[in-house]
A protein has these predicted regions:
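Assembly/oligomerization scaffold segments
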Residues: 1-82, 165, 230
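Short solvent-exposed strand/turn elements
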Residues: 28-29, 70-88, 272-285
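Short, acidic/charged, Gly/Pro-enriched secondary-structure junctions
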Residues: 31-65, 96-100, 104-105, 236-259, ...
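Acidic, small/polar-enriched beta strand-loop surface segments
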Residues: 37-39, 143-272, 278-284
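Long, hydrophobic/aromatic-enriched structural stretches that serve as scaffold segments
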Residues: 67, 73-74, 81-84, 95-96, ...
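Short beta-strand-centered interaction patches in the first periplasmic/extracellular domains
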Residues: 68-72, 77-79, 110-176
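Second-shell loop/turn segments in exported
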Residues: 84-93, 118-120
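Polar, S/T/G-rich
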Residues: 93-104, 126-132
């Protein structure tokens, strides 16, 4: 595509979806002299390269919308095969073994960084649904460089430089806070307890009582919840910021305090301006 014909390009992904999505709008008025050469059709391959020629998206056109002024195409990468294919049978083993079996059935290579053990069964589920049950909610499932990747959170957080931040919408809540948890037996006797003393001092006590089902002390610790922090941040364009990564910011006046997981990203090229929008969830300290 010739750049003057492009009105906008958006490239994004969320943790709840397996596929990255690219949307591009091509103006018909400046494009009509060579639009026939583009021959854009559903199923066509779409590649997006950065300024250095590195491929940052490879997928195919799934939707085309035309009006008198523009043509908008929507393309997905190979992650779409995880949501558009239902699988059947019983899947059992470690998360890695299940992911490997699914990747083999779909003809996609597997790459991962260590998944925990689980057993998944059930016919008629999408490949993405089975993978999500196998590896848990906190892991990023994607197809990168042609390979199925399942990555866990953690690792270094990228500092958000204040001079690069364009817009912030933040939210903090203690509506789901649990700062004391008690595990009881059949007779009501306390078997284990855990608490966050600092949160109790600052916010008052919010207690949860749980019946025993496993290791009582581990149950009590797992039930504790701190305040929740979330944000939507727009920064100057940065392709290195993407779903599954982490950022860090300490700007209480913006509602940003600490380390955040990136749960969704959208890179936008519009009217000559490149920006990146991030959906963030605070990481408990």
């Amino acid at each position: 595509m010739v750049m003057p014909a492009l009105e906008s390009v958006r490239l994004g992904k969320t943790r709840n979806e397996a596929a990255a999505c690219l949307t591009a709008t091509v103006l018909i008025a400046p494009a009509d002299t060579y639009f026939l050469k583009l021959s854009v059709a559903v199923g066509d391959v779409v590649r997006l390269l950065d300024d250095g020629g590195k491929e940052i998206f490879l997928g195919s056109v799934h939707e085309l919308d035309r009006d008198p002024e523009a043509v908008t195409l929507t393309a997905y990468d190979r992650g779409v095969y995880l949501t558009r294919n239902e699988l059947y049978g019983v899947y059992a083993g470690t998360g890695r073994q299940i992911a490997g079996k699914i990747a083999g059935e779909l003809g996609v290579p597997l790459e991962d960084d260590g998944l925990y053990r689980t057993i998944v069964t059930g016919p008629g589920e999408s490949a993405f649904s089975i993978l999500r049950r196998a590896v848990g909610e906190g892991r990023e499932i994607a197809v990168r460089d042609g390979a199925l990747t399942v990555t866990k959170g953690g690792g270094g957080a990228v500092p958000l430089s204040p001079e690069r931040v364009l817009e912030v919408f933040g939210r903090a809540s203690m509506g789901n806070m649990v700062n004391r948890a008690v595990v009881t037996g059949r007779n009501g006797r306390i078997l284990a307890a855990a608490q966050n003393t600092g949160d109790i001092t600052a916010c008052g006590r919010f207690q949860r009582v749980i019946g025993k089902s496993g290791d009582p002390q581990a149950q009590a610790k797992a039930a504790l919840r701190r305040r929740s922090l979330s944000a939507r941040v727009t920064v100057l364009g940065d392709l290195s910021l993407r779903c599954g990564g982490r950022v860090e910011a300490h700007r209480p006046q913006w509602g940003l305090e600490g380390v955040y997981d990136i749960t969704a990203h959208e890179h936008r090229w519009e009217k000559g301006v490149f920006t990146t929008s991030l959906s963030l969830e605070g990481v408990e300290g």
